[in-house]
Amino acid sequence: MRKGVREFALVVAGFAALTALVLRPLPWHLSTLVYNPENNDGQFSVWNVAWVARAIWHQPFHVLDANIFYPHRWTLAYSELNLFAGTIASPVYWLTGSAYAAHNFALLASFVMSGTGMYYLCRALSSDRRAAAVGAIAFAFCPHVFAHLPHIQLLMTAGLPFSLLAFHRLADRPTAGRGATLGLAMALQAYACAYYSVFVLLMIGFAVLVFAWLRGSWKSPAYWKAVGVGALVSILLSVPLIITAVFLQQSGFNRTLAGSRQYVADWRAYLASGNLLHAWMLAYLGHWKEVLFPGFLGVVLGVVGAAVGWRAGRRTREIVVLYGTLTVAALWASFGPDAGLYAVLYRIIPTFSMLRAPSRFGLVVVFGLSVLASMAIAWILERSRRPALVSALLIVVAVGEAMVPLAFGRTLASHPAYGLLATLPDGPVLELPVYSRVLGFRRARYMLDSTTHWKPLVDGYSDYIPPDFDARAEALADFPSVSALTDMKRDRVRYAVVHLEPYEAAMRADLEQRVRQFAPYLRELHRDNELLLFEIVSYP
C-alpha cells in the first residue's frame, strides 16, 4: 500500500514537472499569461471554466443558467459544459478571483491527469514502468492536444486511459465494485468532454465484446453483472448530462453529416505537427486539415508492438486485437462520412448528431498506438543488455517529441467601465455591436469581459444560437432606437455597453445622433474614445 502511494506521488510529480517544462512559463503566471489571447475559442474557454468555477459554489443549482443569451435558461448547455474543468479549477478561482488563473490551472492539470492515467494503463498492460512512462508521454503530450490548447474540453483526455484501465481490471476479476469504478470513470469523462465520452462509450462497448469472445467471458454471469453495474452507474451519474443533451436536441440543435465533411481528416493530418522535432515535415505537406501526427515513437513502436504482441502469448494478443482494431477503426472514422464508417455510426448511434468533427477520432489513433508502443518497449527492454540506458534514451526522445513552441501572451485587460459595471445594481446587459451570425464569434470577448461583473448578457456566443436572438439582433443593433428600446423593454434590459472601435466614422456619427435623440431614456455612466456605458432609465 505504502509503495503504491509512493509510486503514485512520484508519477504525479513527474508529470507535473514535465508539464511545467513543456508549458513554461505558464505555471508561474497563471493570472497574467494565456495561450493566444486573441483567440475567440480560447476566450470562450476562459469564460466557461470561470463560470462553472464560480457557480459551483455560489449557485450550484443554477450552474447551467450561464450569463449569456438572457433571458434564456440552461444556456451553458449550448456548448460543451466543461463541468469537470470548472470544478477542479474552482479552488483556484476562489483563491485568486481570476478567470485566467482558474482556466490555466485546469489546462495544466489536464496534462498531469492524462499522463498519470496513461501511465497506469500502460503499466498494467506492459508490466513495465519504464515502458509505461514512454507510452504516457507519447499520448498525454501528443501534437493534437497542443493544436487545441484554446479548447479546454479537448484537453480532457484522461478519461480514455482511466476508463480502459478500469475495464481491464473488471475483465481480470469481474466484481460489482470494479463495474462501479468503470461506470464512474466513464461518467467523469462525460462531464469532462462530451466528444471523448462518445469515444469512450464506443471503446468500452467494443472491449466488452472482444473480451467476451477472446476469453469466453460471454458465459460468465459475473462478467456480465459487472458490466451491467458499470453501465448502470455510468447512466445514473450522467443523467444531468443526458437531460441537457435532450433539451438541446429538442431546441433544434443537431449536426448533419453534410456539415461534418468540413472537419474530416486526410493523410496529411497524420503527418502534421507543430512540435519542434516534427515541424520540418509541414513544408512538405502544403496544407493540412488537422494535427494528428502520433509522433515518431508512436508510429514506429506502435507498429512493432502490434507485430511482436501478436506473436506473444494469449494475454498480449488480446491487447493487440483490442487496441489494434480500435486504432484502425478510429483512423477509418476520422476520414468522415464519405469513408463509410462514420456515416454508419452517425445513423445507428443517437449521440452522433451532437458531434461535428470526425477528425477528432484521430486522438483514439494516437491513444491506441501509444498503448502498442509501450508493449514494444517492454519487449525491447526485456531483451536488452542495457535496459536502463535504452529506457532513458527512449524517455529523452519522448520528452523531445513533446516540446513545442507556444505563443503565450499577456492576458487581456477589461475596460475600466466593466469595473464600474460590477459595482452597479444587477440587471441584464446589452453589448454592442451585436455582430451578425457570421461574426458571432467576436461576442466571446463580451463573455470574457463579463467575468468582471457576471451580470446577464443579452448577447452570447456558443455552438447553438437561439433562433429568437438572431430574430431580434437587427433591432438591437440599432441601439438606441425605438425598435431596440422596445425590444429591450420586454426583458427589462438595464445596461448597454457600446464598443466604439468597430464603428466606422459615419456609423459613429449616426450613433451619437441617436444617443442625443434618446437621451431622456438613457443615463450615461461612462464615456471615452473606446467605450460608452449607459443605464436605461425608461422606455419609449
Model-derived regions: residue spans:
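Start-transfer (signal-anchor) and selected internal transmembrane alpha helices
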Residues: M1-R24, K225-V233, A307, R311-L326
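Periplasmic/ER-lumenal interhelical loops and adjacent helix-loop junctions
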Residues: N36-A55, A231, V239-V308, W332, ...
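Membrane-interface coil-to-helix junctions
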Residues: L18-S114, A138, P143-T157, R261-Y284, ...
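Extracytoplasmic
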Residues: G216, V396-P540
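Perimembrane helix-loop-helix junctions
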Residues: R169-A171, V200-V233, A306-R315
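Membrane-interface transmembrane helices that cradle and orient dolichyl/undecaprenyl
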Residues: S163-G179
